[in-house]
Amino acid sequence: MGSLLIKNIHSLVTCNGEDRILRGADVYCEDGFIRAIGRGIDSKADITVDGSHMLCYPGLVNTHHHLYQQFSRNLPEVQGFELFDWLRYLYDIWKNIDEELITLSSLTGMGELMKNGCTTCFDHHYVFPRDGGDLIAAQFEAAGL
């Protein structure tokens, strides 16, 4: 994976017990793991990034997702429906989803999550096909999420 050094970060959110925000800190990562946080880190990195205009915060965690719904979430026909009517309408669509749609919708959803800082996601797959959860797990592995 290599190494990454982000120098002089404008604001680094620690999420520690005091909720400290560090100004002008550096972060050094190696093989996907944070190895050092501090000022003036002098490490040779494969990639060095100027963080002076950046906010750095820990990865977000999504504890409730339905990735198979990615391609049916904004259908105009169901906007404004009450929950039961919404579910009845969409179950008619979801009963026909196949392995390819689960794979593609999962990857699309994971891409959106990662783009917006989410590093962990718990997916609730409860519809067809029967082995859909295994397909989604494989996409999590492929995406590194």
Positions of the model-derived regions?
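Residue-level structural signal for beta-strand termini and adjacent loop
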Residues: R39-D42, V61, R73
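A short, polar/charged loop-to-alpha-helix boundary motif
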Residues: K44-D50
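Residue-level marker for buried hydrophobic side chains located in beta-strands
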Residues: L5, I47, G59-V61
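N-terminal hydrophobic targeting/anchoring segments and the immediately downstream early-domain regions
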Residues: I34, M54-L55, Y68-Q70, N74-L75
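Histidine-centered catalytic micro-motifs
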Residues: P58-Q70, H125
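N-terminal metal-binding scaffold of metallo-dependent hydrolase/deaminase domains
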Residues: M1-S43, M54-L55
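Active-site gating loops and adjacent loop-to-helix segments of metal-dependent hydrolytic enzymes
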Residues: F71-I102
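Active-site loop-helix segments enriched in His/Asp/Glu that coordinate
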Residues: K95-L145
